[in-house]
Amino acid sequence: MEITTTLIIIIFTAIVSFTAFSNEKIMNDLIFYPPAVQRGQWYRFFTCGLLHADMGHLAFNMITLYFFGGGVEQNFSILFGKYGKLIYLAMYVLALAFCLLPTYGKNKDNYHYRSLGASGAVSAVVFSSI
């Protein structure tokens, strides 16, 4: 089995999610929380994609990424040559943040709002495969 960028994303996301399932501090430090972003914690636009609400949420996102990501990654390598994997990774990471911009605008003062999951980035990969 080849170690692909997609597989690395899946493994890293699973490790962080499993760790956060049993560690509330990690969950609170990485989750997307708009008031914390307003205090300069911009990393939360990205780190929330490493967290999932439960095993089903994690499994659905990572299985979907596995089935669609490999093809997109391969096509990016064909289209962009040696930069294909880097562009694929950049698309995934930037999609994490981009999909949260409307949410941030709507909830920037909402102290009760939190968000997590990689669904926005996984959706970007799925749409890229079309």
Regions from the PLM with identified roles:
Residues 1-130:
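A detector for small-residue-rich transmembrane helices and their helix-helix packing motifs
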